[in-house]
Amino acid sequence: METEPDQEHLDQNPCARTVEEELSKSFNLEASLSKFSCLDLDKELEFRSDLIDDKEFDIPQVDTPPTLESILNETDDEDESFVLEDPTLLNVDTIDSHSYDTSSVASSDSGDRANLKRKKKLPDSFSLHGSVMRHSLLKGISAQIVSAADKVDAGLPTAIAVSSLIAVGTSHGLALIFDQNQALRLCLGSTSVGGQYGAISALSINNDCSRLLCGFAKGQITMWDLASGKLLRSITDAHPPGTAILHIKFTDDPTLAICNDSGGSVFELTFKRVMGVRTCESRCLFSGSKGEVCCIEPLHSKPELKDHPITQFSLLAMASLTKILVIGLKPSLKVWMTFPYGRMDPSSVPLLAWHFVAVNNSVNPMLAFCRGDMVHFLLVKRDESGAIHVTKQKHLHLYYDLINFTWINSRTVVLLDSVEKLHVIDRQTQEELETMEISEVQLVYNSSHFKSLATGGNVSQALALVGEKACYQSISSYGGQIFYLGTKSVYVMMLRSWRERMDHLLKQDCLTEALALAWSFHEGKAKAVVGLSGDVSKRKAVVADRMVEILFHYADRALKKCPDQGKIQVMEQHFQDTVPVIVDYCLLLQRKDLLFGQMYDKLSENSVAKGVFLECLEPYILSDKLVGITPQVMKDLIVHFQDKKLLENVEALIVHMDITSLDIQQVVLMCWENRLYDAMVYVYNRGMNEFISPMEKLFKVIAPPLNAGKTLTDEQVVMGNKLLVYISCCLAGRAYPLGDIPEDLVPLVKNQVFEFLIRLHSVEASSEEEVYPYVRTLLHFDTREFLNVLALTFEDFKNDKQAVEYQQRIVDILLKVMVENSDFTPSQVGCLFTFLARQLAKPDNTLFVNRTLFDQVLEFLCSPDDDSRHSERQQVLLELLQAGGIVQFEESRLIRMAEKAEFYQICEFMYEREHQYDKIIDCYLHDPLREEEVFNYIHNILSIPGHSAEEKQSVWQKAMNHMEELVSLKPCKAAELVATHFSEQIEVVIGQLQNQLLLFKFLRSLLDPREGVHVNQELLQIPPHITEQFIELLCQFSPDQVIQTLQVLECYRLEETIQITQKYQLHEVTAYLLEKKGDAHGAFLLLLERLQSRLQEMTRQDENTKEDILLKGVEDTMVETIALCQRNSQNLNQQQREALWFPLLEAMMTPQKLSSSAAAPHPHCEALKSLTMQVLNSMAAFIALPSILQRILQDPIYGKGKLGEIQGLILGMLDTFNYEQTLLETTASLLNQDLHWSLCNLRASVSRGLNPKQDYCSICLQQYKRRQEMADEIIVFSCGHLYHSFCLQSKECTLEVEGQTRWACHKCSSSNKAGKLSENPSENKKGRITSSQVKMSPSYHQSKGDPPARKANSEPVLDPQQMQAFDQLCRLYRGSSRLALLTELSQNRGGDSCRPFAGPQSGPAFNSVFQKENFQLQLAPPPVAED
């Protein structure tokens, strides 16, 4: 039943009469709404941007989308199997449970509201984009909200909704309606009704702004007529009682609305009017018992998009605490998409927002959904078949937690984070355009409604946690504007127009930033642009005019703010910061008229500014970006650089300038005065088409010192190089120093230059001048480069008859100048003939050169009476021959002369032509610079195919004849050569080496692998007597390295080697060989005898003996003896061990006995005690402690009561025992902890639950719940694959293990094994057969009466997967078994036998790992098992 409003009460409401007179001058709501309500701006921004590939992130489509019922029945368990959880991901700060919905982050403890994930912050974008957003306080509305709270007890504001009207709900149940001029139009409801219904918790206005829906904190819903202010419906039974209305939303259909309550349920409200009676039907779309929805957003379309094919589905997006759903309300209820969040901070707020965007030339809705710091964009499209497809676009990862997301247009979004900071983001580039604080708004929060405090707080803890930061009803957007509801005010934010953004920067005196922003507008690269024409030419014209205005203002400000006093450097720095900006933007705008007109005149008023201006032009001129400069500016530019002594800069500028802008007379005079030859050449060539005069001037600079034989200065060398480059450019048709000569002048210039070069005499020639002065000067300056210039020129003159004549003529001149004069070096003469040889060797050669000239050159280069420049002469002749000059010589005569002159490289060149490779060996051996290269040469000839057998045999024989010479040259290289190519002649080679030292070096390189020679000893098969011969030489020349060498040598006989070492009295080496032979006792006696002799030497030393040397010798021998005993004790019985250790102990204690009986103590008494203690510690591991003590006490000396002398030894033994016992216990404890951790980790891994990757069978690709034809079991594997048992049986993926059936994953096994599964379990461990751990039966969807899924196997038997994991654990700790270690430790700890010095033990006790020499404890953290 409808309830009519109390009209009289409405008229008497003080709120209706209170109208704020003072309106914000900067805010015109109606104009702004009309400006941003059209779609054209969105389309334009979207089409201008880079297109997004909507197929790149396409979400796979399923044949049969899930029904709403199936989704509602899904559990909201967020746990995922086989994921190692990071406890820090769920770090939630303490939340103030007493916060109210009207409290603001700024006015309360904002630190309790968010757990921000602070990553690196984005850079400040103010200088790039300026101020993008403009915010204004709606003073009229704000004042009336405060007035209503004071005068009519309306309460504080709680919700806002905006359309062409603005509706504000209050905590006492009133709805205040304002028009576009901020005038109060209606006050809906009353405080009495508010006391019954509670606060307004949600508002919604329909599309045509005719109806208002109000949701209340106690669950009621009212509908109002906004035209008349009448109450049309009061709905109390749309949803379960006791829950607050969190959201209420009109759809595009005015008869259909959606509401969401604090129970997490979503209901569809259908409004009908039958026979004048208004009714409301409610239908549950989502039950809160299956997952609480806390945010809903229907898709709204603008009037121009009413016919869009997607609007007929009436899409609705819902966000629960675990997933996003997109459903269609029409024509029938259908789920189109589900998207799970993944792991999120439970206190973060889910957000949804729709907007139509243009992608790939079509306009479609895009859904933005976010929670925490991640924003996802989903594009919704309809295909030709009528189905809806959802594709995922780029996501946005932020460094702050969001509480609101709002579209301004299709390119720009506004985000609000949990500390009330606003972020303006460009969606496609993800660039942050602006940030601003809005704490002054004192934003209203909806916490009390999410906690449902008005109805007793009967909500879940998860929803209450989300409600701490919920402000859904406090922010509303309409027509490109965003309204923020504060506790006492309403603010509106909108994008600034492009002019406003520039003006905002200009007001703050940020002229440089304003120009940069304007240029981005000009180039179409700016973001969030409002107010510019879409036509490119119009846009550039409008922006350019505005930039010119700013540039004038910028120039005036630069002149006004120039420091009046101070150093000139301060003024220069000021203008260097400002003037380049003016120059840059004038040139960018292509306004040279402005730059060299008004701007130059304005800046010329200040001399410093004028100088900086002229200097700013330099980089543009050098890069050819600025060519046309007015003559006056160019004149001032040259004068300025002249005054500052920057002549090189002037020269670089002139050659890039248009010649018409130069004062030629001024420039030529300046160039001559300051020797700016590049500029001079440029002016002569471009200004007067004169190419010869510059050469004459340059020749006058370098010719006199060259003719006088003087060394050129650096400046003269530079001039000569410039002259060569200039001649080369002229002959090649290129302009100097850059550009090209006009095509019509190229032949003329070439002829003029050739005629100039071959002149017989210069213009002002003296009587003493030699002929052809120009050619002579260039040859003296740089022969090689001048000839290179000519060679390049000859390449271009092939088809020119006159040029051919020039070639012959200049060659004749070159020969005449160089051959008939003796003032040229061999290198210069060689360069000439090399040049000639190359020209003569060409197939189209037309030159003629007398052959006798080459013979003269050969005689000149090979003259034996001149030893100077030997290498230079040889190199010149070699280049001449390689260039083709060999055809000009008689080869036999050439070889004779080269041998006579010791030109071995020439000889090699000639011998190689005649295939006399054996003679080349002599060339290498006789050439001290290349003698070591002979080995590579011999190896290449003998191994590389392409040489005949006779040639190889001759080289082989030649090398054999010179073997001793090769060995003396480099023994290691010779040994490698012999091992590779002369392995069968080793004894012959050894016989040739008469020098014993040389033979020793050769054999060491051949046999000792430590020498680095790559020799395969197995293929070499050296007889033992050669190895023994090397050992004997080693004993002679390097006795201290014998043992180390014997350890790596092979193929020697022990008896003969022992005789050799005994011959040279190398006792340690003999002992090593005896031990290797197996005579450990004989080796021990030999070392013991050596030790005793050294101890005797030390005891009878005199004052002149070096004590340290004797003590070092004793210590070294003792250490070797102890090592021998330790190596052999493991293989001996107790009696044999005592036979080794006790004589050693006796030998060490004997000198101490003698010193105790002597009157004066021995000087090394303490050192001997320390060494004796070392012996005791070493033998304690093999001899029982009682046996050692008994042996000591049986000594006649200590048996008579002199135990005090050995007290230190006994106490040291006991301390060692205590230390080792502590170490043993600590090791056992560590091993126990390590094993316990590993077993616990293994148990946790194999008992973890499984999570399927998909909900369909990986073989038949059908959903496991859809198979109705048979009661299949469902088999889930640890790899995540899921199968029907019938499908898996059809693929033969079963095997029998101990009489039980085991399953194997079809995908994993087929990708790792080629054939069928092996029946051998050990083979299955080698492959990657993933066993099943969970079975579910049956596969179809269970009804409520069906029994729960049963486990397949109840017996506690390890399946192959668990066995594989256990084997992996064993491999991690491969080596000595840890269980065996613990068993041994536990057995030995029982009694006295645990002591290392206990009495005789049985064999197994002394064969344990603790007695092994290489036993090591792996004291490292245990490996982390992969989940």
Swiss-Prot record:
- Tell me which species this is from: Mus musculus (Mouse)
Positions annotated as WD repeat: 193-234
Q: Name one GO molecular function term.
A: zinc ion binding
The record's annotation in InterPro entries points to: Vps41/Vps8 (IPR045111), Vps8_central_dom (IPR025941), WD40/YVTN_repeat-like_dom_sf (IPR015943), WD40_repeat_dom_sf (IPR036322), WD40_rpt (IPR001680), Znf_RING (IPR001841), Znf_RING/FYVE/PHD (IPR013083), Znf_RING_Vps8 (IPR056939)
List compositional bias (Polar residues) regions by residue number. 1329-1342
Taxonomy, top ranks, is: Eukaryota, Metazoa, Chordata, Craniata, Vertebrata
Q: Return the Pfam families for the record.
A: Beta-prop_VPS8 (PF23410), TPR_Vps8 (PF12816), zf_RING_Vps8 (PF23412)
Family membership: Belongs to the VPS8 family.
Q: What is this protein called?
A: Vacuolar protein sorting-associated protein 8 homolog
**Quaternary state and partners of this protein?**
Interacts with RAB5C. Interacts with TGFBRAP1. Component of the putative class C core vacuole/endosome tethering (CORVET) complex; the core of which is composed of the class C Vps proteins VPS11, VPS16, VPS18 and VPS33A, associated with VPS8 and TGFBRAP1.
- The PTM Phosphoserine maps to 26, 32, 127
What GO terms describe the biological role, i.e. biological process, of this protein? endosomal vesicle fusion; protein targeting to vacuole
Annotated function: Plays a role in vesicle-mediated protein trafficking of the endocytic membrane transport pathway. Believed to act as a component of the putative CORVET endosomal tethering complexes which is proposed to be involved in the Rab5-to-Rab7 endosome conversion probably implicating MON1A/B, and via binding SNAREs and SNARE complexes to mediate tethering and docking events during SNARE-mediated membrane fusion. The CORVET complex is proposed to function as a Rab5 effector to mediate early endosome fusion probably in specific endosome subpopulations.
Regions of compositional bias (Basic and acidic residues) in chain numbering: 1343-1353
User: Which residue stretches are annotated zinc finger (RING-type)?
Assistant: 1257-1309
Residues crossing the lipid bilayer are none
Q: Which GO terms describe its cellular component?
A: CORVET complex; early endosome
Write out the entry's keywords from A to Z.
Answer: Metal-binding, Phosphoprotein, WD repeat, Zinc, Zinc-finger
Which stretches of sequence are listed as region Disordered? 1311-1355
Q: Which residues form a coiled coil?
A: none
Q: Domain of life of the organism in this record?
A: Eukaryota
